[in-house]
Amino acid sequence: YRVCAVIINDDKILAMQDERSPYYYLPGGRVSLNETAENAILREIKEELEIDAKIVRPLWLNQGFFVEDVTGEKYHELCIYFLIDISNTDLLEKGNRFRLIEREHTHDFEWIEFERLQNEYIYPVFIKKKIFDLPDYLVLQDEHE
């Protein structure tokens, strides 16, 4: 399964792209064997964004059923989305758009205004609406594309 970071600042969400994807997605990645979801999201944030962030709370456990746009591969993905606190980091100093390199991959990051999400090519699609009303507790949901 996977974990993703929901990082918000001034009604903007941090999204990313890489050389393999034409769409935006949220920072995160796969949970390793014997790793907790909480440790995994903090590790992924450290690897991708080079910061030590804090978890505020889990938001969603999403079952996603989709066909990956680039490879055409079918997925049934479980992902836990965490709200992340970056207030004690230097992330905002990197600007509205910035590029970081993780191992051999280049990641382009952008702060996208909530209102702009409707017109963006971003996954998961549910984030376009759910970002306006974050849950106070973990919500189970599914998304079929």
Q: Which positions does each model-derived feature cover?
A:
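Active-site-adjacent beta-strand/loop module that shapes the phosphate/pyrophosphate-binding cleft
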Residues: 66-95, 130
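N-terminal strand-loop-strand
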Residues: 1-26, 54, 86
